[in-house]
Amino acid sequence: MSKMYLGVDIGGTAVKLGLVDENGQVVSRAERSVSFDGYKTPILDTVTAAIRDFIAPHDAPALAGIGVSATGQIDSRRGVVAGTCGNFPGWIGVDIKGTLEREFGLPVTVANDANCMLLGEVWAGAAKGYTDVIGVTLGT
């Protein structure tokens, strides 16, 4: 059986989740609003609940790790939000990596969402096989 990974994209209005195999094939996906109550609920609380609900019907022990793309300036070495994107109150300083590792007992990698988009294109998308690429992303 191939290794399975959980991909989590934390955006300005929604968290998107995908169960992905080691070849990059999406097996299952879901989405949940992060702005449903005007950001009164801390974003990471919403993300954690969404992950819990998403992996419940799947074989969680088979997960090899969690990859998170997040809006804002991300300190990828520590997995912490270093700067805001503007619309998330209380986002700076949030320890995404540590929180999710403690909650789910899996290794977690966190990076900026625009960087992740381009890495995905290089790995399995339109930029596959190219050594020099540029990506432009527009978001909420």
What are these regions (language model features)?
Residues 21, 32, 58, 125-133:
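Bacterial carbohydrate/catabolite-sensing allosteric modules
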Residues 40, 44-48, 62, 66, ...:
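Glycine-rich phosphate-binding loop and adjoining helix at the ATP-binding site
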Residues 2-45, 49, 81-83:
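Short glycine-rich, Thr/Ser-proximal phosphate-binding strand/loop in the N-terminal lobe
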Residues 47-57:
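Alpha-helical scaffold within the catalytic cores of cyclic-nucleotide enzymes
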Residues 5-9, 63-67, 133-137:
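Short glycine-aspartate micro-motif
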Residues 15, 69-70:
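Short loop/turn microsegments at loop-to-beta-strand junctions
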Residues 13, 114-115, 140:
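A generic "binding-loop/recognition-motif" signal
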Residues 71-74, 139-140:
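Short glycine-rich anion-binding loops that position phosphate/pyrophosphate groups of nucleotides
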